[in-house]
């Protein structure tokens, strides 16, 4: 979906532009947003986005794309590709140039727009991609639970639980659901690469002289985030902390110690503790419990660093606000207690756990912030 903007449509010499026309157009856009998302999903899975990126700015026709991707029924496939890319061009996903072909008919060619960098299925730049996250959110399993949102609101409970009779993480761990679990892990890993790269670019709290020598990553999975952080900041010693069955799968990382346990029982000691996308999984009571354990594990003047989406205090018609509120409703749909929060709400949680109410925020990327709280 795009931000509400004024569109001017013209067909057959006529034009529509009054407020009521535009309001209705916007209503249709909102209601038809799944068409854009699912078309983009297919374009990513077919390899169209990667192929346009590989063209390095050169314009490519739908016929050429169909041939390069060896799509069967080339003529029909090329016509379908052209219609898909024409839609995506209207949303600025790709660029489109139209000229008369040898037969006098309109002939379109396409090139990657800047957004395609973040939609690559096979990103090898090291920056990561948002495509795996999008493919996860648009997967059948994760789309199904949206059909239960109304019931979850009217009857109580969580839409995912109503759809599948179990919680999200229990579902992912069940026999037979390995494809969904793999898709989920790929999405989280790719998204983490994007944000951790930006965290290292903009956040100075890990620098030598910042007072951090031992960094504990709570809920750090198999240690991918600490691998990136300690590679950039070799003066740091890392402690990767997660549930024992997760740590059992963690590969050795130079300068990083893997420890298994529960953040609800105990957190290992360090001069700083990192919580990246942990608190948004939990309700307020659970968050305070986690933060209290972090407080106990820190020395005087030690810091807890929260890396989270931060909601604006009131809704705004901006891409950043829309993404944050969109994610918040995803959490409402999938996880009991899970939610996004404002900076003040994070501050209130930290204060309830004993931390200073002085929050030091650093903007990272795509409305993700690093929020530092001191003991």
Curated annotation (Swiss-Prot):
Keywords from the UniProt entry: Methyltransferase, S-adenosyl-L-methionine, Transferase
Residues binding substrate, per UniProt: 136-142
Catalytic activity annotation: (2S)-naringenin + S-adenosyl-L-methionine = (2S)-sakuranetin + S-adenosyl-L-homocysteine + H(+)
Region (Substrate binding): 168-188
Transmembrane segments: none
E.C. number(s) listed in UniProt: 2.1.1.232
Binding, S-adenosyl-L-methionine: 219, 242, 263, 276
Entry GO MF terms: methyltransferase activity; naringenin 7-O-methyltransferase activity; O-methyltransferase activity; protein dimerization activity; S-adenosylmethionine-dependent methyltransferase activity
Swiss-Prot/TrEMBL GO biological process terms: biosynthetic process; methylation
InterPro entries: COMT-like, O_MeTrfase_dom, Plant_O-MeTrfase_dimerisation, SAM-dependent_MTases_sf, WH-like_DNA-bd_sf, WH_DNA-bd_sf
Induction or repression: By jasmonic acid (JA). Up-regulated in leaves infected by the pathogen M.oryzae.
Catalytic-site annotation from UniProt: 280
Cross-referenced Pfam families: Dimerisation (PF08100), Methyltransf_2 (PF00891)
Family: Belongs to the class I-like SAM-binding methyltransferase superfamily. Cation-independent O-methyltransferase family. COMT subfamily.
Chain's role: S-adenosyl-L-methionine-dependent methyltransferase involved in the biosynthesis of the sakuranetin, an inducible defense mechanism of O.sativa against pathogen attack.
Name recorded for this polypeptide: Naringenin 7-O-methyltransferase
């Amino acid at each position: 979906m795009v931000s509400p903007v004024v569109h001017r449509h013209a067909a057959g010499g006529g034009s529509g532009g009054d407020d009521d026309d535009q309001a209705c157009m916007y209503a249709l856009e909102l209601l038809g947003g799944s068409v854009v998302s699912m078309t983009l999903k297919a374009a990513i899975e077919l390899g169209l986005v990667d192929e346009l990126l590989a063209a390095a700015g050169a314009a490519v026709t739908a016929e050429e794309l169909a041939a390069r991707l060896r799509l069967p029924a080339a003529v029909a496939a090329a016509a379908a590709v052209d219609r898909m890319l024409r839609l995506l061009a209207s949303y600025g996903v790709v660029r489109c140039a139209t000229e008369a072909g040898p037969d006098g008919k309109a002939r379109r060619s396409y090139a990657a727009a800047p957004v395609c960098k973040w939609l690559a299925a096979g990103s090898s730049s090291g920056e990561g991609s948002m495509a795996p996250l999008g493919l996860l959110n648009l997967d059948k399993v994760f789309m199904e639970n949206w059909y239960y949102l109304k019931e979850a609101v009217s009857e109580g409970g969580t839409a995912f639980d109503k759809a599948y009779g179990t919680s999200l993480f229990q579902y992912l761990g069940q026999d037979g659901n390995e494809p969904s679990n793999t898709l989920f892990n790929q999405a989280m890993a790719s998204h983490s690469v994007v944000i951790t790269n930006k965290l290292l670019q903009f956040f100075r709290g890990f620098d030598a002289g910042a007072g951090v020598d031992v960094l504990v990553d709570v809920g750090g999975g198999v240690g991918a985030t600490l691998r990136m952080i300690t590679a950039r900041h070799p003066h740091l010693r890392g402690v990767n902390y997660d549930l024992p069955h997760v740590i059992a799968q963690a590969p050795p990382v130079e300068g990083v110690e893997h420890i298994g346990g529960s953040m609800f029982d105990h957190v290992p000691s360090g001069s700083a503790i990192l919580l990246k996308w942990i608190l948004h999984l939990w309700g307020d009571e659970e968050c305070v419990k986690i933060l209290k354990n972090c407080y106990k594990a820190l020395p005087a003047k030690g810091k807890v660093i929260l890396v989270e989406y931060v909601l604006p205090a009131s809704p705004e018609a901006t891409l950043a606000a829309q993404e944050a509120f969109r994610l918040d409703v995803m959490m409402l749909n999938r996880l009991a207690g899970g939610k996004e929060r404002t900076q003040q709400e994070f501050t209130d949680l930290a204060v309830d756990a004993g931390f200073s109410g002085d929050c030091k925020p650093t903007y990272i990327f795509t409305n993700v912030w690093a929020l530092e709280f001191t003991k």
